[in-house]
Structure formats: structure tokens, C-alpha cells
Curated annotation (Swiss-Prot):
GO cellular component: extracellular region
Subcellular location per the Swiss-Prot or TrEMBL entry: Secreted
Extra information: Negative results: shows weak blocking activity on KCa3.1/KCNN4 (IC(50)=1152 nM). Does not block Kv2.1/KCNB1 (Ki >2000 nM).
One MF term in the entry's GO annotations: toxin activity
Name by which UniProt lists this protein: Potassium channel toxin alpha-KTx 3.2
Tissues in which the protein is found: Expressed by the venom gland.
Length: 38
């Protein structure tokens, strides 16, 4: 995944930030969102 500068405690929190970044839903790793490129 592609790390973005968004803090998280769970993967559901990353859905919108990843979409806003123009990518697909990713997951929360090391308290940061990691998105899946399209």
C-alpha cells in the first residue's frame, strides 16, 4: 500500500482519506493509513 499522512486506530477510518487521495481503500498500519493505488 501507499502510506498517507493520516493517523488512524482502525482500518475503517482510512476509507474516506484514501478515496480523497484518489486511491482505493487500504488499511491502518503503524497508526497510519496505507492506501491501495487504482
Amino acid at each position: 500500500g501507499v502510506p498517507i499522512n493520516v493517523s488512524c486506530t482502525g482500518s475503517p477510518q482510512c476509507i474516506k482519506p484514501c478515496k480523497d487521495a484518489g486511491m482505493r481503500f487500504g488499511k491502518c498500519m503503524n497508526r497510519k493509513c496505507h492506501c491501495t493505488p487504482k
